From Swiss-Prot:
Fe cation binds at H224, D226, H280. Residues 199-299 form the Fe2OG dioxygenase domain. It comes from Triticum aestivum (Wheat). GO terms for molecular function: gibberellin 20-oxidase activity; metal ion binding. It comes from the Eukaryota. It catalyses: gibberellin A12 + 2 2-oxoglutarate + 3 O2 + H(+) = gibberellin A9 + 2 succinate + 3 CO2 + 2 H2O; gibberellin A53 + 2 2-oxoglutarate + 3 O2 + H(+) = gibberellin A20 + 2 succinate + 3 CO2 + 2 H2O. This is Gibberellin 20 oxidase 1-A. InterPro entries: DIOX_N (IPR026992), IPNS-like_FE2OG_OXY (IPR044861), IPNS-like_sf (IPR027443), Iron_ascorbate_oxido_reductase (IPR050231), Oxoglu/Fe-dep_dioxygenase_dom (IPR005123). GO terms for biological process: flower development; gibberellin biosynthetic process; response to light stimulus; unidimensional cell growth. Belongs to the iron/ascorbate-dependent oxidoreductase family. GA20OX subfamily. Pfam families: 2OG-FeII_Oxy (PF03171), DIOX_N (PF14226). Transmembrane segments: none annotated. Its cofactor is Fe cation; L-ascorbate. Its EC number is 1.14.11.-. The gene is GA20ox1A.
Length: 365
């Protein structure tokens, strides 16, 4: 089968799109999925200001949301509005470049960073109608983002790298503050998860969803749960994010002053299954492009992911085996297309690997 080249400048105006982009009936979007999902609006500044009543209310709201579907929104977050505007302008500047220029940062097979046009190199069917640019961000290496952008796209794009270096720094700060809230809501204290993620090795992703002339037969991003720990998403003013809860798809309306936050598989494991990594997707429309900024908080690559002992007892045994973020990332890049069962399948895979190693040990001695 010939793999299609996803060039938004060509395909966004066509109705005769390649069949690889058509999703099966039952998986494609329906018009009735526009019902809004009302998620808690969390005043993170109030939580951290020392106001005990505000902190208690935030802790309660976050706990309820995370046990139900794992989504909430954060306001009063301290992110400068001009930085947000710059970050969105840079999305426009990058994705409106000619395809050959974007492909200078082309994502290589088996890697999680780089430019991807609909993941045509990874998958043969049910392709997402989108382009992405992904790169790593680590607090321990402040130059990492700029160095990557300049090395792949050239010196002319240094400012783009500088904007996202600042943005990632702010996202790391905000994510650690959210970790304090999550720790408090789980009863393990504010410091536990904050310490775990202080040396994070995270992923920043720019998403661009071009218009599609067959929006009810395609998806910008297919149904999946994020394998990472925490996702902090800023949407433009074009809706498209949908969450599957209570047996149906529901939309989260964009708010310019808010970030959408959701629990990922790795944090679900860190909470011993208490907090949910929920199924979600992105839909497209036939009129205008949609853009979003996604920061995926991840642990350091070889840090062992395991819940605190206080969340494990006879009534709540271990839900998942120990693993490292490196092993889960490799699994999703090389062995398994992330979906709603990623953590379950990965856990079984780990157990099989461990059993295989144990079976080999007697023969090796």
């Amino acid at each position: 089968m010939v793999r299609p080249v996803f060039d938004a400048a060509v395909l966004s105006g066509r109705s005769d799109i390649p069949s690889q982009f058509i999703w099966p009936e039952g998986e494609s979007p329906t018009p009735d999925a526009a019902e809004e999902l009302h998620v808690p609006l969390i005043n993170i500044g109030g939580m951290l200001s020392g106001d005990a009543a505000a902190a208690a209310e935030v802790t309660r709201l976050v706990g309820e949301a995370c046990e139900r579907h794992g989504f909430f929104q954060v306001v009063n977050h301290g992110i400068d509005a001009e930085l947000l505007a710059d970050a969105h302008r840079c999305v426009d500047n990058f994705f409106t470049m000619p395809l050959p220029e974007k492909q200078r940062a082309l994502r290589r097979p088996g890697e999680s960073c780089g430019y991807a046009s609909s993941f045509t190199g990874r998958f043969a069917s049910k392709l997402p109608w989108k382009e992405t640019l992904s790169f790593r961000s680590c607090p321990s290496d402040p130059a990492l983002v700029v160095d990557y952008i300049v090395a792949t796209l050239g010196e002319d794009h240094r400012r783009l790298g500088e904007v996202y270096a600042r943005y990632c720094s702010e996202m790391s700060r905000l994510s650690l503050e959210i970790m304090e809230v999550l720790g408090e809501s789980l009863g393990v204290g504010r410091a536990h998860y904050r310490r775990f993620f202080e040396g994070n090795d995270s992923i920043m992703r720019l998403n661009y969803y071009p218009p599609c002339q067959r929006p009810l037969e395609t998806l910008g991003t297919g149904p999946h749960c994020d394998p990472t720990s925490l996702t902090i998403l800023h949407q433009d003013n074009v809706g498209g994010l949908q969450v599957h809860t209570e047996g149906r798809w529901r939309s989260i309306r964009p708010r310019a002053d808010a970030f959408v936050v959701n629990i990922g598989d790795t944090f679900m494991a860190l909470s011993n299954g208490r907090y949910k990594s929920c199924l979600h997707r992105a839909v497209v429309n036939s009129r205008v492009p949609r853009k979003s900024l996604a920061f995926f908080l991840c642990p350091e690559m070889d840090k062992v992911v395991a819940p605190p002992g206080t969340l494990v007892d006879a009534s709540n045994p271990r839900a998942y085996p120990d693993f490292t973020w490196r092993s889960l990332l490799d699994f999703t890049q090389k062995h398994y297309r992330a979906d709603m069962k990623t953590l379950e399948v990965f856990s079984s895979w780990i157990v099989q690997q461990q059993q295989g190693q144990l079976a080999l040990q007697p023969a090796m001695t």
